[in-house]
Amino acid sequence: MSAIQLVNQGRQTFRFDTFGDESFWGGTLMLHQAIEGAKLGGVGPGVSPKAALGVGLKVDVDALPANLIAALNHGKVNLDDPATTLALLQLNAVVGVTGFFNSSGTLQSVGIQCALCHSTVDNSMPDLCAGAIQPNPGTGCIGHRLDGWSNRDLNVGAIISLAPDLSVLANLLSTDQATVRTVLGTWGPGKFDAELVLDGKAFNPQQMTDGAVTGTNIPGATLIPPAFGLGGVNLHTWSGWGSVPHWNAFVANLEMHGKGRFWDPRLNNAAQFPIAAAHGFGDLPHIDPDSDVITSKLQALQFYQLAIPSPQPAAGSFNAAAASRGDALFSGKARCNNCHVEPLWTDAGWNLHTASEICIDDFQANRAPDQRYRTSPIGDLFTHFKGGFYHDGRFATLNDVVDHYNACLSLGLTASEKSDLIQYLLSLTFGPKNSTPQSGQMSSGSNEQ
């Protein structure tokens, strides 16, 4: 298979493959019934397009016929009617979600894809967000796909809570459905707790930053990271669970509930992962290769993720002269380059550090096998401003991040040096470094290839 064929196959998997998980999201949770609503054969009020956009779901404008686009632009489409949502699902236009329909036109089931969390759309139709959501800067509600961008508008907890039957999750967590819904309601936009079904720890009892308590009972959900800029990066996720294909297999099997084979004996550690150990998540039952619809797709999926181009900052989005001064600080006085090594923007090698090294609590680190935090690649920060920075979003702005490291590492940065450093951070993209930071060549573009 050629490289082009691998990219195309991986893109198809990333955007449209449910890995058979509709048997869970529809068959077990009955989420499709909540989407269509009682009037259309389901339960409850149903999910209108406006409600769907309000929880961060996106619509791919390239999947819409021209007459529908024209009607949308003229306000002639009822965005308050769940029937319109079903029509969009029939067009395969809802990013990251596939509807499976009966011959009568009612929903039979629903499944999700990688793109649900790791894609969004551009703001080419900005008026259609009105009354639904204020999207992450540079993105929209209905537009062209932006693969690899973290969907910081997506309220995963709210979406799961729509499901009529959460008994499987309640039983797994040894609690009741009401408690599960309460926990899901704490996540908020742009966050997901992948470890909850492994350890049952829904809240960080005491958040510590620079030696001070900065919060108590903080939700354990972490920010959804981008799925681009992964070339040359060793360990993936906020706490370095493993490589990109390891995490793809982990998520496809254990989080999306697709049909495949997964092996990670570290999950047999009952002291650290009591739920995972009790349910054999570290060694999923062997299945017939013809029934495994995940493993054969991991190669192309990783290949596509590595091929997703680095978005470029919008023209004028940072001060080039200040960024040039910040460049010198980054590799000098500020010592950022000690860990965020150019041009990977993470450590070249085993990219993990203890909580004490970065002056924060170890709650999230202790939920991963190595009990450390990964040095996050910091290219293209402009693509995910919403929700804050660090794994739990504890720092609202880049100013807060720089202030934190200034205190943690006793850097002695002046106000002007901090400002220059931030301008440099705003200029960073993945790939070969320009000799002089440019002020931006283009706004965000589609990853159509």
What are these regions (language model features)?
Residues M1-Q449:
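Periplasmic c-type cytochrome electron-transfer domains
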